[in-house]
Amino acid sequence: MSRDAPIKADKDYSQILKEEFPKIDSLAQNDCNSALDQLLVLEKKTRQASDLASSKEVLAKIVDLLASRNKWDDLNEQLTLLSKKHGQLKLSIQYMIQKVMEYLKSSKSLDLNTRISVIETIRVVTENKIFVEVERARVTKDLVEIKKEEGKIDEAADILCELQVETYGSMEMSEKIQFILEQMELSILKGDYSQATVLSRKILKKTFKNPKYESLKLEYYNLLVKISLHKREYLEVAQYLQEIYQTDAIKSDEAKWKPVLSHIVYFLVLSPYGNLQNDLIHKIQNDNNLKKLESQESLVKLFTTNELMRWPIVQKTYEPVLNEDDLAFGGEANKHHWEDLQKRVIEHNLRVISEYYSRITLLRLNELLDLTESQTETYISDLVNQGIIYAKVNRPAKIVNFEKPKNSSQLLNEWSHNVDELLEHIETIGHLITKEEIMHGLQAK
């Protein structure tokens, strides 16, 4: 069982180690096993004396002895045994594991199976030990990289997502964020968007207010864009892109902000109409940078002006520009975005018509919307259910009524207002008649 080091060691072995290490080095040249045995004797003495500094030196020496001679199986065995020794110091175990990790990193020629076996040994030794949780996380990441190179994405995602790095108090914030971002990315590659969403909530967005996390912020919001695109949550995509757009590294470089601002426009026009969508699209319209993007500016203007649009004309005008964009409209994968854009155009037209007409025939409405009767009724039903417009369809008469019926309170208020207005007019007329009578009386005299 491991333990914390006491404030003061029972005995200082530093001088003894200085004398013994040269002898052990000499012995190791001919008999590695005997050298290892002597080091294990020293390890026991330093451990029992609670001499942390000397214990670290001995454990590091054991790692050097075995790793430098490629005795990785022996190293795995010693790492397992020494970590279980009674009274073993926590910091000594941590130091030994760190030394093994250094050798793993520097041994580029090490065969894959051996590398995996050492990583797995470290993972077993560090399991459920808080004082080596960071080391466990780092070797797990190395194992995940190997799995990714082998194309085992699902396995890599499962291994990495086991780590609850957000609870690691000894890990730097930037490293925590990097781990969670990689967990999110692997979950997306695996196709588990629900897990990716859960993982994204482990990062506090206010953390990104610190400029030193700017690159991580961009990576984080790009991953959120992928998640929301999969869910077809266009308004969320636009909001995440806006966070990217507001980042100094993007805002200061025209080559970077132009595509981001274009994407914001595209996903705002793809978003269903609502208070937030309407607010955001008007804010974007007032952005001075939008003037440098002619096509995008004119597209925003179409959706913020109370005028009807013809879908065939919109498609013909913007198709060449929009098809160049791989994220929003280009390629077969984004074909459904064109369908959604057509829906938004029709919904915009229906809102405009509901403002200008109190009643309209279905035949005329079909002509204005370029739709069949059943399609028109479907769109009316959808917008009514969303609470965006009021409409009632009289099927026998084939008339659509957009005028909302007034309740008793509204009718009473309107009647009261009309009566007040009528009395004011009567009073004004009375004054005018009196004035005329006076003028006529003066003229008669």
From Swiss-Prot:
SUPFAM superfamilies: Winged helix' DNA-binding domain. It holds the Pfam family PCI. N-acetylated by NAT1. Signal peptide: none annotated. Residues 233-407 form the PCI domain. The keyword ATP-binding does not apply. Present with 5710 molecules/cell in log phase SD medium. This is 26S proteasome regulatory subunit RPN5. It comes from Saccharomyces cerevisiae (strain ATCC 204508 / S288c) (Baker's yeast). The lineage of its organism: Eukaryota, Fungi, Dikarya, Ascomycota, Saccharomycotina. The gene is RPN5.
